[in-house]
From Swiss-Prot:
The species this protein was found in: Listeria monocytogenes serotype 4b (strain CLIP80459)
Family: Belongs to the CinA family.
SMART domains: MoCF_biosynth
Superkingdom of the source species: Bacteria
One Pfam family hit: MoCF_biosynth
Upper taxonomic lineage: Bacteria, Bacillati, Bacillota, Bacilli, Bacillales
Protein name: Putative competence-damage inducible protein
Length: 414
């Protein structure tokens, strides 16, 4: 099976000024092709170091995919260094040169000489058209290696890879095994606990393989299988998925790239259930999250951020007696907040967040203590307590996700 290495060229990547999202995209695409990516390399705009990286990559990878360094400036050196390494000439590509000329002519501007560099390619390479920019891409087979050169901007790189580079890679792959992956998403269990529960599967299984990753207050499990056919690979993945569900299905909330909040929002839209929120602990984060999704105005009627005792009483109409006797960090306060916001906004569901974000304690409660209230029309209002750590912003994000999980659990059960 062919192995690939992705080489990102650009000092700005090493300085942390730009995130290397290109590598993640290409890796996902190659995985679907059954081509394994074993190495990601980032190198600055330095000729000596780039040449060293090329030599190292050739010794361990069949396919070398470069991103960046194809532009018009002096530090765009990728094709120059690779051409010299392969002892090949640089030649002009007519299509891209005409495209650049037409651009400047149509705007009555004079093209500087350095812009012509974007239309220069390595001889004997297949030109990859840049439909959204000027820098030509290249695909080259030489000395039992495949070299793919792509521009750095993702808006240019992604369509070039998808439309031109990937079909060429697939045409060369021949009898490559099919690689099938499935992403499972869990909430309410830590990565270490989940990994321990699945340890026998993780250690003993070779095909499929199982990997766990800690996400943003969640755990992601990836199952990956290889086989000669897609049907066989899917069967292998399915068998492992069913065993994981048997053990940890309680904590599963979804699959693939769909977030918990997106999933719950879709469920609310499908059921045509309206919702409102009263927030203290989370200070509007829940409302900001649910408002991200298209069509949300059909079900999200509004909410309130009542951070102080005074606003809880004056705006949200929480009973002064409840606050005096039970405190704002209490089940009683959370319930009243949820019920009142639902009543005031005239919604089917009201959710509330009140607690101690941290790092200091409040009313004798340690940092990270939170009560989430859930009021649903026709059902008894409930309040749920959780105790997190001392990291204030981490606690707030986790509470928002916890709120969506509570809504999902209710919708699943009713």
């Amino acid at each position: 099976m062919a192995s690939a290495e992705i080489i990102a060229v650009g000092t700005e990547l090493l300085l942390g000024q730009i995130v290397n999202s290109n590598a993640a995209f290409i890796s996902q695409e190659l995985a679907a092709d059954g081509i394994y990516v074993y190495h990601h390399t980032v190198v600055g705009d330095n000729p000596t170091r780039l040449k060293e990286v090329i030599e190292i990559a050739e010794n361990r990878s069949d396919i070398l995919i470069f991103t960046g360094g194809l532009g018009p400036t002096e530090d765009d050196i990728t094709k120059q260094i690779l051409a010299a390494h392969l002892q090949k000439q640089l030649v002009e590509d007519e299509y891209h040169m005409n495209k650049i000329n037409e651009y400047f002519t149509s705007r009555n501007r004079t093209m500087t000489e350095n812009n012509k560099l974007q239309a220069v390619i390595i001889e004997d390479s297949i030109v990859l058209n840049n439909d959204f920019g000027f820098a030509a891409g290249m695909y080259l087979r030489e000395n039992n290696h495949t070299y793919v050169l792509l521009p750095g901007p993702p808006s240019e790189m992604k369509p070039m890879f998808t439309s031109y580079a990937n079909p060429l890679l697939l045409s060369e792959s021949g009898d490559q095994n099919i690689l099938e992956s499935k992403i499972m998403r869990f909430f309410g269990i830590g990565e270490s606990q989940l990994a321990a529960d699945l340890n026998d599967l993780i250690v003993t299984q070779v095909n499929p393989t199982i990997a766990t990753y800690a996400g943003d207050n969640e755990v992601v499990v990836r199952i990956t299988a290889t086989a000669k056919t897609k049907e066989e690979a899917s069967r292998l993945v399915k068998e492992t998925e069913e065993e994981i569900l048997r053990r940890e299905g309680t904590f599963l909330y979804g699959y693939g790239e769909v977030s918990l909040s997106e999933l719950v929002t879709a469920m609310l839209l499908e059921k045509e259930l309206t919702i409102s929120a009263a927030e203290s602990f989370t200070a509007g984060l829940f409302q900001a999250e649910i408002a991200r999704f298209p069509g949300i105005s059909k079900i999200f009627k509004g909410g309130m951020v009542t951070y102080s005792e005074e606003t809880k009483q004056s705006i949200l109409q929480v009973s002064p007696q409840v606050i005096k006797e039970k405190g704002v960090v209490s089940a009683e306060c959370a319930k009243e907040m949820a019920e009142n916001v639902s009543r005031l906004c005239k919604t089917d569901i009201g959710i509330s967040f009140t607690g101690v974000a941290g790092p200091d304690s409040l009313e004798g409660h340690p940092a990270g203590t939170i009560w989430i209230g859930l009021s649903v029309k026709g059902y008894e209002t409930e309040a749920f307590q959780f105790v997190y750590g001392r990291d204030r912003n981490h606690n707030r994000r986790r509470a928002v996700k916890q709120g969506f999980q509570l809504i999902k659990q209710f919708l699943d059960a009713n």
